[in-house]
Amino acid sequence: MTDMSLLGFMEHLAGFTLRLEHEEHKALEHAAKVIQTEAKREIGTYQGDAGPFAAWQELADSTKADRVRQGFSANDPLLRTGEMRDSIEYTLGHHEAAIGSNSDIAVWQELGTEKIPARSFLGGAAMRKAHVVAEILGVSAVQALVGPRVRIPISQD
């Protein structure tokens, strides 16, 4: 370990806030991409429960028949043209990231309606990747403290 004077340590800590903000921004973007990728992956495949989000119900026979009638596969839940999947985006704020869609259909599917059971692909994706996000954010704080001398690998599972 390198010896550091008290003054050197104070200078190191003074730069910590700036490094933390920089690392936090990078980490939030990385975490948002992880959740966005997972949410897109879930479209078209039945999902089990994840935290407070229930497992997806089987599509109704009438829905399957309608899908086939319109030229789509019978049983790929939430996937028709791919437009809803492609609408999943993220935005970054100062200390937060938001992953979502501006599609009304995405809202109806995520939250459910009177006639459509909720099939959470955003909340479910966030729950399934929470451990990866926690690791990304934790590593970013460590990187800010120790600086670029040490690189810590982050798992993706």
Task: Locate predicted features.
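Short, Lys/Arg-rich flexible segments
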Residues: M1-D157
